[in-house]
């Protein structure tokens, strides 16, 4: 009787949230790939407990009262319903749900996620792809929810490099030479460059000591340049962990301890992947509810985490092995372990390292034969297939480096257990050195194991060597990365955690989830569901797409003339003074720099990626527009994500061209070879879906709210002249299209410049 009464009350509450013209459909749809399906919150709540029904509906109602001008949206209610059904185990294994801008996806997964986490006594982990969104959820969205859930406990798990190291900060803030000398003995570069830097560090230390600052780089108003932050922070290899005097007050470890008590943990994809691999940091996978926001990044993040690269220059490698043998000898002499590892015996260790060096030297000789002598170069092995001789060397290197990794780990554990009867400074220095050696051999072991594999996740492993010049010296590197990571994601995530939500404003390309399914390993036959929500905006009325009548396509051969025409049309738009806030997006840094050469007289108006950190550029852009000034942000594809500028802040977006993936990337080339071997067309499977995805994100910068308006200018006639152009346009929101004429662009003479070489992927 009680449950029936609660059900009736809940239905009345929820019905009050639906306008009469927006009644939920009585039938439940199993899958929704297209526009139009609508779940009501009441439809799913009937399958959950009365307590959960009451809790979710009450929080949703209270939230509306907290947010000024809150607009109830059917897509948001649908998302709450779908998320709850998945996390509650009522429907499907995992859920991939595309929630366009304006749906309010963050709160749509937090409300049911927190309710179900409490009901099942689990931890809700929300993972993002970048620090900006992670900090927004931690600093804005969760504090908002805490107003309606006063006892909510949440924390953030940022990467170690985002936190200040109190040991390093103390050294850099100190004015006492003895204190600096003591800490500098443990590590290099722990003295301030000048008095101003020392005072800045002293102010940071004061804020940290008085709890005005939590130690996160993004949470202080004090300017910290990258060079100073590199010395203020630390990494795993340079951290003393529990052996550090500052361990209990260290912001990084304080945050890690808070995870054990938190109901909600805000993390990032790389940390989640690492935590699932090592079974550390986060609670047991079976006790997690996981939401992967910006989930379209997951396959790339997983691939980056599994990519291995290492320097293998023979003289450099000899030096590292010599340093390690001396380090082991010092440990044996000064901190002798109770049980001596056989490999630590000098004769055995020297012979082991000598064999390792000879293999590295042989590999150097072989790889150098594939590249022009005495200069920077690169060689990729077709389909990831190594010559037999190289493969045998890699297999042996995997065994030898793994043995050294085990030896370094054994000594590190032994050193960490030593008592205070030893010279603490000398002990800590050895711990740091052994920790770094462990990191090196761990990475090397993974590299050679991956190099020894023919396939990973049913696809080839890309393998290539590079020769790079640094300070006048040539260095040899070896690289490996799998082109598919679905097996790893299945093992670490899909099979380990009962229910996962994968969400983003853009999950589909070309109106299909197929690319996401292929890259991530999510699949309908495993019980995974794929849902695409409606956009709450009226794009037809709020904006339009402008495709200027360019005289040439944006090919490499025509790039100069194309950019000249683009600059001429852009200048015309600026001079019209119709728009205060503008954004210009480029497919390459080369094209962006060439465009800037054509608009030097407008340079003061342009805020260009790389001039300052992105958040500083956006702050300045906001200030300019607020003061009635015109302002133009100029950047690459990264500026097409996470940029939320509403109204006059951004009313015109300029897109240089369709952003197909780079054709010179070793990974892209190997994937193309593999697809051809399977009689699949790389352009259809690889290039076009990627281009569609990029274009959707770029166009999505314009309409961010019901009050937004403006134009998206795309300088690429192929959208109208090529067969695939229609498919790309069909995947975009429905805008009216205009085709204005373009002023003739005067091609400038191109200055010859040597572009710096970078390692390609």
Spans of model-derived segments:
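Conserved interdomain hinge at the start of the Helicase C-terminal
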Residues: 551-587
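Signature of the SF2 helicase/ATPase Hel1-core->accessory helical subdomain module
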Residues: 109, 115, 135, 140-143, ...
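Conserved pre-motif I regulatory segment
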Residues: 48-97
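A contiguous, basic/glycine-rich beta-loop/short-helix subdomain that forms a polymer-engagement track
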Residues: 230-263, 273-282, 411-543, 548-551, ...
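A substrate-engagement module of RecA-like helicase motors
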Residues: 47-64, 71, 120-123, 128-263, ...
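Conserved helicase motor "Helicase C" RecA-like lobe of SF1/SF2 P-loop NTPases
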Residues: 587-610
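Conserved RecA-like P-loop NTPase helicase motor core
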Residues: 548-558, 611-720
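Conserved RecA-like ASCE P-loop NTPase motor core of nucleic-acid helicases/translocases
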Residues: 123-130, 501-505, 580-587, 714-715
